Amino acid sequence: MKKEEGGAEMRLMMKRGKQKFIMKDYGRKSEFASFLPGIAGTLGIPIWCYYVNRGQCVVSFGVDNKDHAIMEFYPAHTAYQNVKRTGFRTFLRKNGSYMECFSKESAEQEMEIGRNSLSIQEKMEEEKLSVKVDYFILPGEKVGALVRKVTVTNEDDKEIALEILDGMPALIPYGVDSDSIKNMTQTSKAWMLPRRFRQLRAAIFPSQSWRMALC
């Protein structure tokens, strides 16, 4: 199935029994939001993953519900605006020149949505680079996880010097619920930032519900 909308192509692909929805130039289309189904198998721990068709797509993810988010949860109308700033980001330095992937919607981009996976790809014609990001829920393990794989390909015949900075700008420690983040932001930050922990060998928290791993 193929459909033309706003000069961008959408199609449904069947390959070896796997159904995938492919959208070209997804950043130029009307906004939409959805969730990965969180399939983790009978022995796994499901993770919910909330994504939109902007930037690197993933806005928030966590376990159980939005009170157990690892990346802060935003409603759709806010997520469309924030995903490029608070979601996953990838910075490259090629031969001394800096660039950020998936930051320009005018670039050639493609989104591929599977049953339990999401992939995006961008071709940077001027820099002769292509970047692909794959997301999927880790199945069959005792720990729940959203797996993210970033692949950068040099499309030029020449060797290049390439440096990569990639990741998410902030994460929420265990025990910090959505209401605390939204309505007690500065207080929550103070609870998240124990100081002189290594010197004192101890940290004081307001209640047993605020548990976090300190490494």
Go through each PLM region and give its residues.
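Anionic coordination/interaction segments
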Residues: M1-C215
